[in-house]
Amino acid sequence: MKRRYFGTDGIRGQSNIFPMTPDLAMRVGIAVGTIFRNGAHRHRVVIGKDTRLSGYMLENAMVAGFTAAGLDVFLLGPIPTPGVAMLTRSLRADIGVMISASHNAFRDNGIKLFGPDGYKLSDDIEQKIEDLLEQDMSGQLAKPEDIGRAKRVDGDIYRYIEQAKRTLPRDVTLKGLRIAIDCANGAAYKVAPSALWELGAEVVTIGTEPNGVNINLECGSTHPAALQKKVHEVRADIGIALDGDADRVLIVDEEGAVIDGDQLMAVIADSWAADGMLKGGGIAATVMSNLGLERYLQARRLKLHRTKVGDRYVVEQMRQDGLNVGGEQSGHIVLSDFGTTGDGLVAALQILAVVKRQGKTVSEICRRFEPVPQVLKNVRVSAGKPLEDAAVQQAIAEAEAQLAKNGRLLIRPSGTEPLIRVMAEGDDRGQVERIVDELVNVIGGVRNAA
């Protein structure tokens, strides 16, 4: 069933344009509150946000919805997404909300929802919310004496800092490391530098002056050039780039090279396997992760469990197969020993632990495998189903035959934008580029004909 509101990571869109309007945010609060107010106890919700301007508007709208449904609201202020997941459990809340559009520009915003266990909601529960949003919910409002209250609990972000610090092995400190960190002018602008400094590092910061409109603006994990420049400028041992809500991370080594999530997962999997910490004999990663990662793990008798795109599907696979490491090439790294969702700061701390223990440079630690050439292009579509066209299906079959066992082909609709993503990878870059270009032309031709 096609859903109207929820995508692969909650509800997302441009602020003040459907579905990211204050009216819908209030209705989401009522709908979610209706579903999660089971039991006789006083129900509560925690709400965090990143630093984008529209966060104030949406936060207040959701407070109105939740309190109207009879839930008390704890407002955390700017805090990383994993902090919301952690505090949802710690504060015994019935629901957790993160208001963020992650790595998107300030004009966008989104609503991510966590259950009382700190995990993102299942597709079934999201469908129940969608069903309620299509109904008249006036009958679901609380009695006057049962309306909820709201209060700010800004100090609870320090509980998240302490939780993150505890994930660094006790025999490791960060003394002697010069770390440049880019917080994307986002949710981690206070907590991440504080945690690194308290663990003993010399910390150089960029992207820590949010003004409501500069989140992810030429900074953060999607724009690492600023951090690469800073690493060179201050001769840092390592650069850490977070995104707007700090649930993803990329690393810049001492030479200025960017290290993506695939390489980071390889480092953590290798280290944890050697220490007897890795569970399930492998890791979970999405279909977008490089074939080089899969080959690297296979050579070490570890299995790569592939999932659909989206960290929520990575987490589902991890829970199903008993894995404790998973993630995405984009830098979502999920370490279930420490949390229930991607956590950029915690993942970075695990890399720093390996660097300190082995006494090697970041470039020596993090370049674990040579990525297989990978080409990704997008085709914009406004209507129709071009992937069902006979000519497109024939072109896909021919491309798969060309790649055979030497590569991979992935064609999928985007979960957040009106795009079809065409990705191929293989040992022969020229062949991969030709295949992607041919498929883009065929899909684009069908789109235009429609």
Curated annotation (Swiss-Prot):
Its cofactor is Mg(2+). Mg(2+) binds at S102, D243, D245, D247. GO terms for molecular function: magnesium ion binding; phosphoglucosamine mutase activity; phosphomannomutase activity. Binds 1 Mg(2+) ion per subunit. Transmembrane segments: none annotated. Keywords: Isomerase, Magnesium, Metal-binding, Phosphoprotein. The active site is at S102 (phosphoserine intermediate). NCBIfam families: glmM, PRK10887.1. This is Phosphoglucosamine mutase. It comes from Rhizobium meliloti (strain 1021) (Ensifer meliloti). The gene is glmM.
